Amino acid sequence: MNYMPGTASLIEDIDKKHLVLLRDGRTLIGFLRSIDQFANLVLHQTVERIHVGKKYGDIPRGIFVVRGENVVLLGEIDLEKESDTPLQQVSIEEILEEQRVEQQTKLEAEKLKVQALKDRGLSIPRADTLEEY
């Protein structure tokens, strides 16, 4: 097999369906249409997939340009196995509400953790409270 270095290896994956995981945690699924030397991607017929528990919802995004430095993971989707998922698809409104509830629960748990540490005389410095020297 002949392997090309760097992002040139993605040329073989153009026009195939891919899953892209971004640095901010979002998951995109779409057809890879273009790449460049910086791994910037152009995805077509893109959907943003939101997972909460055993449910997921897809938000249509259309054509999506992704800056290469924001890509954490890029993988081709096997079209034959794509429908064999144990997850249940729900409406956009339902998955967004479940995501909001999950985020609120995590935030409350983090507040309890910080308070417990504070009660013990410990603290974790937060990024927004640190000053640059």
UniProtKB/Swiss-Prot annotation:
One of its GO terms (cellular component) is nucleus. CDD domains: LSm1. The keyword Phosphoprotein applies. InterPro entries: Lsm1, LSM_dom_sf, PTHR15588, Sm, Sm_dom_euk/arc. Pfam families: LSM. The modification Phosphoserine is found at residue 123. SMART domains: Sm (SM00651). Transmembrane segments: none annotated. PROSITE patterns: SM. GO terms for molecular function: mRNA binding. Keywords: Cytoplasm, mRNA processing, mRNA splicing, Phosphoprotein, Ribonucleoprotein, RNA-binding. GO terms for biological process: deadenylation-dependent decapping of nuclear-transcribed mRNA; histone mRNA catabolic process; mRNA processing; negative regulation of neuron differentiation; neuron differentiation; RNA splicing; stem cell population maintenance. Residues 5-80 form the Sm domain. It is found in: Cytoplasm; Cytoplasm, P-body. The modification Phosphothreonine is found at residue 129. Belongs to the snRNP Sm proteins family. Plays a role in the degradation of histone mRNAs, the only eukaryotic mRNAs that are not polyadenylated. Probably also part of an LSm subunits-containing complex involved in the general process of mRNA degradation. Interacts with SLBP; interaction with SLBP occurs when histone mRNA is being rapidly degraded during the S phase. LSm subunits form a heteromer with a donut shape. This is U6 snRNA-associated Sm-like protein LSm1. It comes from Bos taurus.
